[in-house]
Structure formats: structure tokens, C-alpha cells
Amino acid sequence: MTQLDLIRNFSIVAHIDHGKSTLADRLIQLTGTVAERDMKAQILDSMEIERERGITIKANTVRIEYPAKDGKTYVLNLIDTPGHVDFAYEVSRSMRAVEGSLLVVDASQGVEAQTLANVYQALDAGHEIVPVLNKIDLPAAEPDRVRTQIEDVIGLDASDAVLISAKSGLGIPDVLEAIVTRLPPPKGNREAPLKAMLVDSWYDAYLGVVVMIRVMDGVIRKGDRVKMMQTGAVYGIDRLAVLKPQMVDIAELGPGEIGVLTASIKQVRDTRVGDTITHEKKGCEAPLPGFKPAQPVVFCGLFPVDANDFEGLREAIEKLALNDASFTYEMETSAALGFGFRCGFLGLLHLEVVRDRLEREYDLDLITTAPSVVYQIYMRDGTVQELHNPTDMPDLTLVDHIEEPRIRATIMVPDEYLGDVLKLCQDRRGIQLDLSYAGSRAMVVYDLPLNEVVFDFYDRLKSVTKGYASFDYQITGYREDFLVKMSILVNDEPVDALSMMVHRDRADLRGRAMVEKLKELIPRHMFKIPIQAAIGGRVIARETISAMRKDVTAKCYGGDATRKRKLLDKQKAGKKKMRQFGKVEIPQQAFINALKMDS
């Protein structure tokens, strides 16, 4: 059991690539928490995809013991949080589990959009924040400019920011001293009833579900019977441990301490991030504030390229869902793509990560249908429906109005690209809320429909700014707009996988782009194929793939025109019949490319 004044709990806040995981590696290395031979880069990022993309997806923790200059040995608990907006709720829970943050900013790049979003979360959680300027050994580093930027944009005093290079290890001892001297110790009462926050949980093949907790009040011991306050489920604790980053067993955890427990829990869904854990008997009265279940925001269909892989996909998705409570799925059938799943995600990065993990860890080839968001449909009879899939759109005569989710987007961009960014946001039905400057960078705040962002907004933003813009968003709520369902018909047959919800003003443009793209992708057949984009019964765009034609008059010599006419009429009648009964083969690649549309 550690004294409260010798504990420091902290997280590291940074934009992607500003050196957060490298700094964590150095802190672990310098304090000898992990033996040199076991040390590897990004030691806290356990998933292969986290290493490869250089991002942190799950919150990870490590307990470091540090003998400080004042002669005392402190216990430092670092929670390494995800920096990406899709995992914002995980970040907010992790922030509530600690008392302070290190704000890591790249001395050559300055403050970025995600830095801002995460700093505001840290400030909301009441954190003490220590600014750290990383990569000061780079030729392009400008510590003084970045210091003023931190003061102007965030409003933090950065005069005593710690200067480091996480890569070479320069300045790391100063960071450890700053954690001990400038961050506050946790508060808590040993004698009070147990109150612990569930920070994260993951599935382990041998142990079942492993739950990471932060004890606020009271003491938790091995063998205790504990209750989850949101679900009401009761479990007996099999094992208590701290992570160094490997599990090290411990007898009890007291106030201010962070550790993990296992209790024969079968599914991650039974453990909800942000829930309060207390004793079954003589537990605490009220749970910790701020709990909310994760809500999927973006939906799309996942189908196997080879129909025989469906069972493999089902198993893979079930295993992934064990480890990811925010990922939802249900079975779906599509006339064009066969059997698959309709899956819900927290955002686009979450979608990409899940798809990459399915393809890589389970060796599957997948087709992803166009991502869609959740619409609220207000019916004439006063009921409200949630629409996850455009193909389930009810008859328009029964619909009063449709509301779509809106977001507040913050974009940081060098001012020479500002015009292009403003144009992109206006094209996507954005409403400008704010524009401010910090040095040579502009910060734009826009209100945008999420539907316009999930498609390819991020890619377009990166291309118009040569990769210099950074982007972050929060969902603000729902608003009514003039939305319609656009169907694509090939040879007069609707193709369900290609239908989408669009704004009426952009439908013509979107429809024309889609039919032109399909015209290039679908191979020619022996008969003429019309491709149409339609809203209800009205066709808004059409292209025709001409038929392949055999020269039936080649064997006619001489000048008898009636003979040629007869042969041509016979061919024409055959083509007509063929079109009536013929099926159009749409290759899988055509679906994949059509869904990668850039409009």
C-alpha cells in the first residue's frame, strides 16, 4: 500500500507523431521498469496495427517507481491515452482517472487540432498541466515560437516548459522531476466504502476479461465480492495486479492507485468504461459522475469477397467484439453482395482500424459499403425512427422530416491554404463559426454535417493543404435538413449496396459522378445496359453502356438490301430479348471502386 503523497497519476496529451509513445518508452527505460533486453519501441502499444500506424487505440497503463532527488521513492502511474477523436470517450475516462497531464508539443510543428481537443478535455477534468517541448534537437525546432503559441492558443503559461528530445533521451530526468514536483498527489479516503472507476477493459484468452481500475476511495483486496453499479452484476475477484507493463500480482489496491483485476468475466460488454465498482455489501451510495454508454456514430456493411468466408468473418467479428464494447454488429443480406454484417463504429478511424484488424489478424478479404451515419426520421404519425442503413428508408409519403447529426470541426491550417479549406467546408454544407490566427497558422471552426465528413473529407482536406492541415471534431447534435435517398439502378434493377442518403442540392452532382464511374467499371455485355441514379421514381442521372455487336452482315455479298435488313432485325430482336432476360454481372472490383468515389 503506497502513501497518497508518494503517488502521482498522469497521462500524456499530444497530437499524432509528436512523440507521446516515445516519451513513455524513455520514462520506462530510465527508471528501469522494463529490463533493457525486453525494451522495444512503443512498448505500451501492444496491437500490431497501433505500432504500424503509430497511433494508440486502447488506453494502456504502466506503474513506474522513481527515486526522486528529495530522497523519497515515488510511484508514478502513467495512462497512455488514445489521441484520436474517435476514442474521445476513452480519453475522457482516462483523464478522470489521473490528476495531471504532460502536454507534449513538437517544437518544430507547434500546436495542432488534436492537441487542442485533448488539452480541453484535460482542463475539463481539472488537471494540472506541464508543457513539454519535444524534438528540440531538430534543425527546424523553434522552442520560443511554440512557447508563445501554447500561451496564445491554449492560454497556458509555457515559460517553464520542459525541453526534451524523447528520441535521444535528452531532458528526460527533468520530466520525471517535473511530474513529482509540479503535479498534485491524488486524494482519497481509505476508510470510506470502496469506489473505483473502470478505466478500460480487454479480453485475454487465458484470464477472460481484464479490467483496469482506478481506486478513488476505500480498499479493494483479492477475494472481495464486487458489484458493477451500471449493470448490477456481482463478481468475485480472482486476481489483483499492477502493470509494469507486464502483470505483477499484488494483495490490495488503495486510494489513488491504478491496477487491474480479473473476476471470471466472460465478455467485455459486461464491463462498461466509466462504470463504478464497489463492494457487494456496504458499497458506496452513488456512482461516480459522467458515465455514458458508447454510441456508434458511423455504420457500414462488411461483406466477404468470397461468400465461403462468411463463417470465418462471423467468428472474427465475434472475437473482435469481445475486446471492443463500442463496436456493434448485426447480420445483413444484400442482393448484390450476399451475406455480411452491418457494423457500427465510433468514427472513421475506428472503422479503418476494425477493418484492418479483420483483414490482417483473420486473413479475410472484405468489401466495405459506403459509410453512413444515423439519421432520425420523424414520421407523420408522431413516431421517431433511427435509420442506420439507407435501404431501410421508409416511404417518403409517411415521413414528416429527417434530421442528421452535425459536428463542430476545428481545423488548424497554414494561412496560404486557408482559401482552399474554406471552399472545401462551404462545398460540404458547412457553416463557419470562428476564424482566428496564431502566428502563420489559422484556426477555423465549422459546423458541418457528419454525413459530408464520413465520405472522404479528411482525404480531400489533406490533399488541398498538401498534408499540413490537422482536423478534429465533436458531435454537437441533430438538425433538420432536406435529405433524400438516392438509389442506383443497373439495367432497371436497384443495387442495394450502392444506395445512399444525400442532400437534395448535391444529389444531381453525386448521382452523375456515380453513374459515370459505374459506366467505366462495368464491362460491356451483349446488350445495352442503362445505369441510372434515381430519387424515388425520378431519374436524375443516366449513362448507357453500349452493347457489344457481332457484324451479322459480313457474309452477305452483292447488293440485296432486304437480306441485310432481315439479318439486322433478327439481331435486334435477339438483343431485346436478351436485355429482358439477361443478368448484368457487376464485378466485385466495380463495387469497391465505386464506393471509393471522390465527389
Curated annotation (Swiss-Prot):
Required for accurate and efficient protein synthesis under certain stress conditions. May act as a fidelity factor of the translation reaction, by catalyzing a one-codon backward translocation of tRNAs on improperly translocated ribosomes. Back-translocation proceeds from a post-translocation (POST) complex to a pre-translocation (PRE) complex, thus giving elongation factor G a second chance to translocate the tRNAs correctly. Binds to ribosomes in a GTP-dependent manner. It catalyses: GTP + H2O = GDP + phosphate + H(+). Its main location: membrane. Belongs to the TRAFAC class translation factor GTPase superfamily. Classic translation factor GTPase family. LepA subfamily. It is a peripheral membrane protein. Its EC number is 3.6.5.n1. Pfam families: EFG_C, GTP_EFTU, GTP_EFTU_D2, LepA_C. GTP binds at D17, H18, G19, K20, S21, T22, N134, K135, I136, D137. It is found in: Cell inner membrane. It comes from Cereibacter sphaeroides (strain ATCC 17025 / ATH 2.4.3) (Rhodobacter sphaeroides). PANTHER family: TRANSLATION FACTOR GUF1 HOMOLOG, CHLOROPLASTIC, TRANSLATION FACTOR GUF1-RELATED. Disulfide bonds: none annotated. Keywords: Cell inner membrane, Cell membrane, GTP-binding, Hydrolase, Membrane, Nucleotide-binding, Protein biosynthesis. HAMAP family: LepA. Residues 5-187 form the tr-type G domain. GO terms for biological process: positive regulation of translation. GO terms for molecular function: GTP binding; GTPase activity; guanosine tetraphosphate binding; ribosome binding; translation elongation factor activity. This is Elongation factor 4. InterPro entries: EF-4, EFG_III/V, EFG_V-like, EFTu-like_2, G_TR_CS, LepA_C_sf, LepA_CTD, LepA_IV. GO terms for cellular component: plasma membrane. It comes from the Bacteria. The lineage of its organism: Bacteria, Pseudomonadati, Pseudomonadota, Alphaproteobacteria, Rhodobacterales.
